[in-house]
Amino acid sequence: MAERRAPSDAAQLAPAPQRPHLILGSASPARATLLTNAGITPTIWHSGVDEDALIADAGDRATDPILVTQLLATAKARDVADQVRSGAVPGIPAGHVLVIGADSMLAFGGKVLGKARTAQEILERWAAMSGRSGVLFTGHTVIDLTNDRQVDRT
């Protein structure tokens, strides 16, 4: 019968895997709050993506909320990842770093609605939507800077 041995001291003292440092490439206070409430404290870093220009470049495809939200989420994540790699984002520890980019759009009344730009636009949308419903689409891109792996979901 084989003798049972206790794990070696080295195995018992092996450090736990390091939790990745998360960078949220979004200006959305709601996204930051959601992560914080889940016990994750991200570094917040806004991308330099010109959303209006990207949507304009999408042409006819800009009517597809799935495509547009994913296009914007990916562009934001890649922009922030590039900034981190270049050293433009201060206070990022060495090690495992993940960047999240996200964007949401509302499909309502046959249109894709981006962010309202003014208080008046918000009031007009609320009035138009009263008693009706739309569909909110959110695109997410996560980039692992350790291996440049990218995952996209809408």
Listing of model-derived features with the role each one plays in the protein:
Residues 2-98:
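N-terminal polybasic phosphate/anion-binding patch
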Residues 34, 83, 109-111, 147:
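Short glycine-/acidic-enriched loop or helix-start segments at secondary-structure transitions
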Residues 94-104, 108:
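Glycine-rich phosphate-binding loop
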Residues 104-134:
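Active-site-adjacent loop/tail segments of enzyme domains
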Residues 54-58, 106-108, 147-154:
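Acidic/polar active-site rim loop that often engages polyanionic ligands
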Residues 2-12, 135-154:
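Phosphate-binding/catalytic loops
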Residues 35, 73, 103, 122, ...:
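Residue-level signal for inorganic ion chemistry
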